[in-house]
Amino acid sequence: MTATLIDGNALSKTLRAQAAERAAALAARGHRPGLAVILVGDNPASEVYVRNKIKACEDNGFFSLKDRYPATLSEPELLARIDELNRDPKIHGILVQLPLPAHIDSHKVIEAIAPEKDVDGFHVANAGALLTGKPLFRPCTPYGVMKMFEAYKIPLQGANAVVIGRSNIVGKPMALLLLEAGATVTICHSKTRELAAHTRAADIVVAAVGKRNVLTADMVKPGATVIDVGMNRNDEGKLCGDVDFAGVSQVAGHITPVPGGVGPMTITMLLVNTIEAAERAAAAA
């Protein structure tokens, strides 16, 4: 059996078209959605991510603002800029690209963003509200994964789901969203004993640890849905995920590729969150 491919590029295209329609409707009422992206330093991977985010905004009718600063930028200067953006009515979403230079406290920076403009969903107010099932914003990557389940009609209610990874950005919010959807969720991580015993019993496995081949074919229940959030490089320098795709795709029922799976969805859900922020602001105006 070969798994059905969950195509993140195709689904993203559909969702971005819907976002562009909503953006056009808002713009017609004088509320064009606006996203500000802040990049500090010259991390090459961060530069690529920021470029992709800005392009997605431009391609779909959003106003975008890119603030680029040298790695020597002080924390007070960055906080002052965030304060300005918080008060700017043209900006509905603020995103600070992580990681930040060592002398800047990323936690303090994220907390400085107004919760209603925290389109990454990282602010403590939004992270906490996720526990109650009523966040202003869901973190983009887990939100994108949930849209994949929806589009491919993957049943979540009553399903056994394993999330490998416990980061605040993916692992923990992913587990909460699956729980909210009615799945029975197990979170596994570097200290988990016998990872395979958990994954073999799972209907759904989400791998999000940033480690190659953390999930192999012998660890997967036949017909399971496997979501690969990992971003790594193989020995030839090619992009790969956390899952041994060649092997697991022969066992799983559905699987996401890397690249072309979860990655495009993350930026798409950033657009969706920004649209939602703009719609709220327009309703309150």
From Swiss-Prot:
Q: Listed GO molecular functions?
A: methenyltetrahydrofolate cyclohydrolase activity; methylenetetrahydrofolate dehydrogenase (NADP+) activity
Give UniProt keywords alphabetically.
Amino-acid biosynthesis, Histidine biosynthesis, Hydrolase, Methionine biosynthesis, Multifunctional enzyme, NADP, One-carbon metabolism, Oxidoreductase, Purine biosynthesis
This entry's Enzyme Commission designation comes to 1.5.1.5, 3.5.4.9
Q: Which reaction does it catalyse?
A: (6R)-5,10-methylene-5,6,7,8-tetrahydrofolate + NADP(+) = (6R)-5,10-methenyltetrahydrofolate + NADPH; (6R)-5,10-methenyltetrahydrofolate + H2O = (6R)-10-formyltetrahydrofolate + H(+)
Question: Where do the coiled-coil regions begin and end?
Answer: none
Instruction: Please list the GO biological process terms of this entry.
Output: L-histidine biosynthetic process; methionine biosynthetic process; purine nucleotide biosynthetic process; tetrahydrofolate interconversion
- Supply the InterPro entries for this chain: Aminoacid_DH-like_N_sf, NAD(P)-bd_dom_sf, THF_DH/CycHdrlase, THF_DH/CycHdrlase_cat_dom, THF_DH/CycHdrlase_CS, THF_DH/CycHdrlase_NAD-bd_dom
**Keyword Amino-acid biosynthesis (UniProt):** yes
Q: Which residue ranges traverse the bilayer? A: none
Give residues annotated as binding NADP(+).
165-167, 190
Cellular component GO terms held in the UniProt record: cytosol
Pathway as given in its UniProt record = One-carbon metabolism; tetrahydrofolate interconversion
Q: Which NCBIfam families match?
A: PRK10792.1, PRK14186.1, PRK14189.1
What family does the database annotate? Belongs to the tetrahydrofolate dehydrogenase/cyclohydrolase family.
Fetch the HAMAP family from UniProt: THF_DHG_CYH
How does the record describe its quaternary structure? Answer: Homodimer.
Q: Which PANTHER family match?
A: C-1-TETRAHYDROFOLATE SYNTHASE, CYTOPLASMIC, C-1-TETRAHYDROFOLATE SYNTHASE, CYTOPLASMIC-RELATED
The record describes the protein's role as: Catalyzes the oxidation of 5,10-methylenetetrahydrofolate to 5,10-methenyltetrahydrofolate and then the hydrolysis of 5,10-methenyltetrahydrofolate to 10-formyltetrahydrofolate.
Q: What is this protein called?
A: Bifunctional protein FolD
Instruction: Give the originating organism.
Output: Burkholderia pseudomallei (strain K96243)
The uppermost taxa in this organism's lineage are: Bacteria, Pseudomonadati, Pseudomonadota, Betaproteobacteria, Burkholderiales
